Amino acid sequence: MANPVKYESLIVVCNGLERLFGNIVKVISYPFHALFPKLRFTIPEYSPAKIKSKQNTRITKTIWQTNYSNKVTLPVYANYLFNRLMSLSYDYRYVSTEERETYIKENADTRTFNAYSKLTDGAAQADFWRVFTLLQEGGVYIDIDGHLVFPISQIIRENDQEVLIKRRDKYTNFFLACEERSPS
């Protein structure tokens, strides 16, 4: 059963303002990348939590993201920085295409790894990896171009086992959070 959303009106306002800011960054990035066409920013593979939280949660305090490369344009990097600001009490992990395959090979049984290996589309591989990793490790998955609209410490509650987002009455997959559910 879904829990009521805390601060729902404030979250809606914040989301609108953040989208406006994001669009401004995108507009600015066009002339920026016209002047510096080869310049890319590096998203770190690991960034530890910046503050220690006293809040204990069932959901692991790790943000997971994946992309074909951690060398990104200004808008994607600005989005990463904004998400870090909204998740200061969480570790951050970026996983590349190659690292996704290595992780699944090291942590899955042969049947599961073979199923992953048959996927040829990068988006399908990322979908498989995100669900597999969340079940193994727990934590929060956010698409590389997705943004948090409110501090994650205010979204995930102490006893939440999973947090999913609905948009127009349908569940999305750009944000998924769950506790570790490794098979025993």
Curated annotation (Swiss-Prot):
Keywords: Glycosyltransferase, Transferase. InterPro entries: Glycosyltransferase_domain, GlycoTrfase_DXD_sugar-bd_CS, Nucleotide-diphossugar_trans. It comes from the Bacteria. Pfam families: Gly_transf_sug. Transmembrane segments: none annotated. GO terms for biological process: mannosyl-inositol phosphorylceramide biosynthetic process. GO terms for molecular function: mannosyltransferase activity. One of its GO terms (cellular component) is membrane. Its EC number is 2.4.-.-. Belongs to the glycosyltransferase 32 family. This is Uncharacterized glycosyltransferase in aroQ 3'region. It comes from Actinobacillus pleuropneumoniae (Haemophilus pleuropneumoniae).
